[in-house]
């Protein structure tokens, strides 16, 4: 028996020793960041776009670089996604390698994956089809966005090196960043949004003088995109909170554009020592890869005022208190969300109560009186704001009518009816008394 105990103790000690030896090896695996597949036209893009990729690595992203026609490409294996994010920096690809195609990427988006796409004037059919799936329509191949009033001084003469003003950005700090930006350099293909798709976001538009056409041909027909309808960068947040960003310019993410000075060719234009491309690219990547604008619901509670636990059923006209915790992802940590426009609805089929929630400490709460209607209701919070994930919380409760012992003996509002009833009784009594005791006069012959 002693020998067995010694053997078991020795085995346990060896197991603990082995575990401590494996911990350093397991640590990097557990601490790895979001798995991101990067598809490139050629691997040289790792050098020409190194600043953007370095910003992702500095945020602990695990990047896997492959050419877009690599025969070993795969997004899904045994029904599970191999990556959390997808970056497509291969605008000219005609066919993806391996088992990746537009349908696979659409399935990846439907599964909640995030996709960042950069196109150019040499755009292939796969990216065009992917854009159509997401409500974005690219212009024809070899076309470019042209602006004869807002081009850079270093433009070669076709006026396709566009200087986009920060005023043309979407007014959503969660998506484009909260700091003021310098003008943005853009050279690439134009896009237009599907007017029937309310999920498409016009992140960066062209100026009123921009249009999309072949830069080396005279204009013989109305351009595909004109003025503010010309999209330079567009986004999409699907109903399942999956996010996609389309940029019409691959050069937008390049080191050359990040470090370039920028100045409009118009006389008297201000010169900036650096573009705002880097700051905008980082902000877009943080949003599309769900580092910004991600909300979640924490504990939810409801009870009568003065109590702490929810009842089996509420009674009509009860005074209740509802509270909910809403958190936001910030720098990898969940912190309390700060908002002043969160509403609560008390819904049966239609809302009977709609009121704002007020922040108290780390939660949002409100007190209100239940309607004088019984049935099955829901406490519903449906928060859908630009740049944030769709937040939804519903809690079902029952509301019953008053019990017989809970009604008032006399209802003040019914006093007129009481008076009419008693007056009717009194009148009937007087009439009966008079009628019974009244003696008719005898008729004389």
Curated annotation (Swiss-Prot):
Q: Where in the cell is it found?
A: Endoplasmic reticulum; Endoplasmic reticulum membrane
Named in its record, the pathway it takes part in is: Protein modification; protein glycosylation
Q: Which residues lie on this side of the membrane: Lumenal?
A: 33-415
Q: Which GO terms describe its cellular component?
A: oligosaccharyltransferase complex
Regions that span the bilayer: 416-436
A Pfam entry, by short name: OST48_N
Q: Any keyword Heme?
A: no
Just give the chief location class. Answer: endoplasmic reticulum
Q: How does it sit in the membrane?
A: Single-pass type I membrane protein
Record has Protein biosynthesis as a keyword: no
Q: Which GO terms describe its biological process?
A: protein glycosylation; protein N-linked glycosylation via asparagine
Cytoplasmic-side stretches of the chain, per the record, are 437-445
Entry keywords, A to Z? Endoplasmic reticulum, Membrane, Signal, Transmembrane, Transmembrane helix
Leader sequence residues? 1-32
Concerning its family, UniProt says: Belongs to the DDOST 48 kDa subunit family.
Q: How does it assemble?
A: Component of the oligosaccharyltransferase (OST) complex. OST exists in two different complex forms which contain common core subunits RPN1, RPN2, OST48, OST4, DAD1 and TMEM258, either STT3A or STT3B as catalytic subunits, and form-specific accessory subunits. STT3A complex assembly occurs through the formation of 3 subcomplexes. Subcomplex 1 contains RPN1 and TMEM258, subcomplex 2 contains the STT3A-specific subunits STT3A, DC2/OSTC, and KCP2 as well as the core subunit OST4, and subcomplex 3 contains RPN2, DAD1, and OST48.
Summarize the protein's role.
Answer: Subunit of the oligosaccharyl transferase (OST) complex that catalyzes the initial transfer of a defined glycan (Glc(3)Man(9)GlcNAc(2) in eukaryotes) from the lipid carrier dolichol-pyrophosphate to an asparagine residue within an Asn-X-Ser/Thr consensus motif in nascent polypeptide chains, the first step in protein N-glycosylation. N-glycosylation occurs cotranslationally and the complex associates with the Sec61 complex at the channel-forming translocon complex that mediates protein translocation across the endoplasmic reticulum (ER). All subunits are required for a maximal enzyme activity.
Which PANTHER family does this chain map to? DOLICHYL-DIPHOSPHOOLIGOSACCHARIDE--PROTEIN GLYCOSYLTRANSFERASE 48 KDA SUBUNIT
Which named protein is this?
Answer: Dolichyl-diphosphooligosaccharide--protein glycosyltransferase 48 kDa subunit
The source organism is Canis lupus familiaris
